[in-house]
């Protein structure tokens, strides 16, 4: 079983980042190393906090082909197209229908947001499944477990990508302003990633999470559900940095290469 944590700042796209790429060199190298370690998995499932959703229902895109570009960031020429995995999507929807812990509905649009596109500008899946988050943090672990169950039933080589940035309040000039809880939050998440300790992420104090101004914790909790007891098997943190007041973490869990499902 394999999964990873990926940041999603659009400035990682060279045409957008320009000279600023030099300030996120550790993140770029981390993503490149992650991509090399993962190889070309059969399917990548991405959970993005920026995918349009409902407050209480995850949305999984059902279009045969999924597309997106960075036009909203002034770079429409950076465009991507991926094949969906209809068998996995169909099974997710079918099993969610009988699972009271997961509310999952089909999404008809084929557009991918930057929370999906930035990680996928480095990674090389044969197929892509895109799922959104919901409001309640605690419900995401069950979603991850559902994805794991479906991958096992299909015998799929699935990599779960938890897309998300850490605190947006690390410095006085950060996008969301400064809050000292931001640094504390990031330190806790990085330590948890180093140990594969996803259980601790589900029990973080609510005030700390709110003060941090994060956008990745829900995705990380879902990844923990997907990995289960395998989370501690081979955790590896490639990089962490926050040069613009936002924390960027790149980490992998599970074997570097090989099928996610035996």
Task: Give the role of each language-model region.
Residues 158, 169-173:
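Short conserved catalytic/interaction loops centered on acidic-Pro-aromatic/His motifs
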């Amino acid at each position: 079983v394999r999964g990873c944590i990926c940041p999603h700042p659009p400035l990682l796209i060279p045409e957008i980042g320009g000279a600023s790429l030099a300030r996120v060199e550790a993140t770029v190298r981390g993503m490149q190393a992650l991509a090399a370690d993962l190889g070309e998995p059969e399917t990548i499932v991405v959970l993005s906090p920026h995918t349009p959703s409902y407050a209480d229902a995850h949305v999984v895109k059902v279009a045969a082909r999924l597309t997106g570009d960075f036009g909203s960031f002034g770079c429409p020429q950076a465009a991507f197209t991926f094949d969906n995995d209809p068998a996995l999507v169909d099974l997710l929807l079918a099993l969610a229908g009988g699972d009271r812990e997961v509310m999952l509905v089909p999404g008809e649009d084929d557009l991918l947001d930057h929370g999906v596109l930035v990680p996928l500008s480095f990674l090389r899946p044969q197929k892509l499944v895109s799922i959104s988050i919901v409001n309640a943090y605690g419900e995401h672990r069950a979603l991850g477990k559902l994805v794991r169950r479906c991958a096992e039933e299909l015998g799929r080589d699935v990599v779960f990508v938890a897309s998300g940035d850490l605190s947006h309040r690390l410095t006085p000039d950060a996008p969301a302003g400064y809050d000292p809880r931001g640094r504390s939050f990031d330190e806790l998440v990085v330590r948890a990633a180093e140990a594969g300790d996803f259980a601790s992420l589900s029990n973080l104090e609510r005030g700390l999470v709110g003060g941090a101004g994060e956008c990745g914790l829900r995705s990380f909790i879902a990844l923990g559900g997907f990995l289960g007891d395998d989370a501690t098997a081979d955790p590896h943190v490639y990089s962490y940095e926050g040069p613009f007041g936002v924390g960027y973490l790149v980490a992998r869990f599970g074997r570097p290469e090989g099928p996610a499902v035996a």
